[in-house]
């Protein structure tokens, strides 16, 4: 995974931002944890399979904002988080996590908020066999004005982000003036891809994060 921090002033200068209205909808949290394990016997050895989910459930008088955060964490079809993750855990133990030493750990946490927005981070690891676990990490920012996601639709032309992201990757992860490395690792702007995940806001930066193998094979 690659987490890219872009100064917010640079983003606003380059592409513009439409939301300016303020509000004071404070979001508190109600922590929820679901954790269990089962003992599995196999011809290769006996051990436990583990499942853990930690969630900062939103508590706010802004019902639209609360519902949209829950839909992002769960789905559009339910707000019953206990039943949703109980079913997810049962499915994990029955399918991917039915081998010794398997595990799944997920976290949805409230990262920060201002009068304008609230940002959540989702991260975790899963291991169901093979050489290494599968990690994930991404964020999302919701407007406190109308509860909407403040992602790519914030920008008049998201394609302009490609050049900014490419230069930010080069600055944060690679030594300057390494021409050979740049030749192998950086695509031309016309073929450079934006990440699948929406960008989000952290304090003084806009953040984009590429998933495993999304822009590289190693």
Predicted segment positions?
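Sec-dependent signal peptide hydrophobic core
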Residues: 5-9
